[in-house]
Amino acid sequence: MEALSGMHEPSPFVALMRIYCNDYTNRHDTSVCPLIMEPGYTLHMGVHDLVGRDERYTPAAMKQFTQFPGLCLTVNQIVTNGDRLVMRFSEHGASNRHDGRVAAWNGIGLYRWNGKKLLENFVEQDYFSRTVQLDGGDPLPVENPAIAPWDSPAEPENPAAEAFVRGLIESGDILDQPALLFDDEWISGAAGDRVIEPESAVINDIFSAGDHVAFHVAMSGRLRADSVLAGDNAGEKVLLHMGAVVRVEQDELVWGRGVRDRLGLKRRLAQS
């Protein structure tokens, strides 16, 4: 069949992620994992590193599928340069550990592959929001799906945009960007709880594609008194992991979405 006029060639990385989303995640079929992931596949989320596809990753995935037997993944955005790919997504379903209560939550994953299979993923999911919903809060809406995620083209790297965003992260100014919305702030459209006053950051991953830059960072700083997480811990030095994808135009961050490990931070504060 000839390609439709004006259509670009599909990205092989995007084609792999189509299998990841449709054949593996949404069918809960872990037998697909060896077809799309190398044995050493590693998932990084918050302070956790799940090293090994069969030893660590697959059992964790099965635990999720057991809790949410009807779990669905909806793709909200895919950006790739061919070598790297970021996927913004929503997961939603009913938890059999919470009497069937339903929840929807966002996630952002930065994927690495070797041209054939997945090697690594730096990901954050908004489990804080999920917990609030499952504990009796109103379920959040599922964000609109990407119109044509599997037709997302590979775009060239943009070193200038990447350097600009790296500078925002290293200075701490990334948290002051009004166009960067975290977690469920997309519903109101306004930036809210910034959680910490940043002091330093470790960039775990960063790459660019066209005018987009994706990054995953571990940011250290003081817990803000106005944060919902503060309580008696205001001013305490904490570590907050976050993943994001932003769009840069003429040295300005004009759009962005991020997800933070607020639940992990809350649990660490409770243990301190």
Where do the PLM segments sit?
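C-terminal and inter-domain tail/linker signature
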Residues: 1-272
